[in-house]
């Protein structure tokens, strides 16, 4: 859903009219207003932070602290979506080979998880965003993110189980 950012620019004393994007109930500001101040980075919540409908552009526009944290939250969401709670496609494995724990279904009722599981197009967008976050991490820090392997495992599982290839992001609901 596209809306306009209504944040006042402190340095210009005017209302910003740039587009912003919403996923689930997550309210994001446009790129020029976004500083991460409204975001809870704790492990208690998972979120999807979207600054652009293109998953790759959205990843490049996020600040460093989100590039570090968001691949893990993406893996946590995808592991719930792939588990018995939604698609029942199997497990996603951490860097050490152990699967993400989905037994209790943590985050399964979170609005962002529900959004991502609502259609394969939403799931595809989240996977591409997670992979783009991991790539952006590599670009900024010169090393692979700990979730890199899990994200690409999720992508391969998606191709195998959904019977779809992730190529179009404009189909996100």
Predicted regions and their residues:
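Cysteine-centered motifs
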Residues: 5, 16, 30-33
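Polybasic, lysine-rich low-complexity intrinsically disordered segments
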Residues: 3-4, 13-15, 39
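An N-terminal structural lobe/cap that precedes and organizes the functional/catalytic core
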Residues: 40-138
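Charge-dense polyanion-binding interfaces
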Residues: 124-159
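Aromatic-residue-lined binding/catalytic grooves and analogous aromatic/hydrophobic interfacial grooves
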Residues: 156-173
């Amino acid at each position: 859903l596209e809306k306009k950012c209504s944040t006042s620019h402190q340095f210009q004393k005017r209302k910003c009219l740039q587009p912003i994007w919403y996923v689930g109930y997550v309210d994001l500001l446009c790129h020029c207003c976004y500083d991460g101040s409204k975001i809870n980075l704790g492990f208690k919540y998972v979120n999807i932070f979207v600054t652009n409908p293109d998953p790759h552009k959205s990843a490049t526009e996020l600040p460093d602290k989100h590039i570090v944290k968001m691949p893990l939250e993406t893996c946590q969401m995808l592991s719930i979506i792939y588990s018995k709670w939604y698609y029942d496609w199997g497990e996603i494995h951490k860097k050490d080979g152990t699967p993400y724990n989905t037994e209790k279904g943590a985050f399964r009722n979170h609005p962002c998880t529900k959004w991502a599981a609502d259609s394969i197009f939403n799931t595809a967008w989240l996977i591409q965003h997670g992979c783009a976050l991991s790539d952006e991490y590599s670009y900024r820090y010169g090393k692979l993110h700990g979730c890199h392997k899990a994200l690409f495992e999720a992508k391969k599982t998606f191709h195998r189980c959904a019977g779809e290839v992730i190529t179009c992001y404009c189909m996100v609901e």
